[in-house]
Amino acid sequence: MHTKAVYPGTFDPITNGHADLIERAANMFAHVIVGIAANPSKKPLFSLQERVDLIKEVTEHLPNVEVIGFEGLLADFADSQGATVLIRGLRAVSDFEYEFQLANMNRRLNPNLESIFLTPAEENSFISSTLVKEVALHRGKVDQFCHPAVQAALKEKLQQ
């Protein structure tokens, strides 16, 4: 079976936690689309195109991973890509309630869509894009939390 999965998120920026989930998903599914949400309700540090470019660089070693920015409903995006699986990461129990509601809403909007929840590797369980940006903002070292390309992009962006 040629199952196509979407791993959606804002990825502002992509962290080692995200990269780990993408790599694991790439081993589970024939084709993984990293769907980068434009999400107008959030004020991202990086533009949509910058986030696409960073994730392409981080995932370039994974031939079955495609990176696409999107606007609108995730359920519609997944349908337009022919995906039947949504991959979501759960860092802590506190993530579950929101993700459970989201999974049910997405299934209601697109009955062919199943949500799969992956937990992070222990060393990545506390990492979030928000925390990585906060550490970088205060000139802390983020090398253990994100890819070198992301480190360089953060440094450049925060010096502006």
From Swiss-Prot:
Disulfide feature: none
GO BP of this protein: coenzyme A biosynthetic process
Biological or metabolic pathway of the protein: Cofactor biosynthesis; coenzyme A biosynthesis; CoA from (R)-pantothenate: step 4/5
GO MF annotation: an example: pantetheine-phosphate adenylyltransferase activity
Positions bearing the site annotation: Transition state stabilizer: H18
Name this polypeptide is given: Phosphopantetheine adenylyltransferase
Cofactor dependency: Mg(2+)
Catalytic activity of the protein: (R)-4'-phosphopantetheine + ATP + H(+) = 3'-dephospho-CoA + diphosphate
